[in-house]
Amino acid sequence: MKKGLFALALGTFTLGMAEFIIEGILTDVAHDMNVSIPQAGHLISIYALGVCAGAFSLILMHKYRPKKILLFLTSLVTLGAVIATIAPSYWLLLCARFVQGLPHGAYFGTGTIVAVKMAKEGKGTKAVAMMCAGMPFANLMGVPLGTFLSHAFSWRVPFLMSVALGIITLYMIYKWVPEVEALPNKG
């Protein structure tokens, strides 16, 4: 696997962690934040709302090079994880989850373009599949690990793990993802 594709896949893994980690730690969060489990469940819904709202951000970012967009989006999900890690209140944690959701759709759209452009002729589909592989790995490995860390230490530790993943992903995208042309604006 090319290093650039690995960086993109780590980005989807990081997004998958951001999206799904809450499911394994929901009861710990509810207990610590002194809210009911159904109320803590809004932390899942608000992420989805962020995904929907953030999908439109590509309209505003179309003039920038895809690598810069990926760096910005990865920074945003990492910022959300930082806020979640230190959130002193349920309401700030809700805001953090919304911020974490914002880059989701735009990252996949931009990452797909970059993966195809990085691929050899006729291998674009394989490159996109490799990039998207991070998401199921987040479910398979990241969520159980995050749940274990939450139960063993604190629900904040999995978010801290997301911060570390985000920083590593930023470095890898910066170092290994090539500059590709922005898509032409057709309308």
Predicted region positions:
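Short hydrophobic/small-residue motifs within alpha-helical transmembrane segments
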Residues: 47-49, 136-137
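Helix-loop-helix hairpin linking two adjacent transmembrane segments in secondary transporters
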Residues: 92, 130-175
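Helix-breaking motifs and short loop linkers at transmembrane-helix boundaries and internal kinks
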Residues: 34, 86-92
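Cytoplasmic helix-loop-helix junction between adjacent transmembrane helices
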Residues: 96-134
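Paired small-residue
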Residues: 80, 91-100
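Structural signature of the two symmetry-related core transmembrane helices
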Residues: 69-82
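Helix-to-loop junctions at the C-terminal end of transmembrane segments
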Residues: 54-66
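Extracytoplasmic
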Residues: 4-40
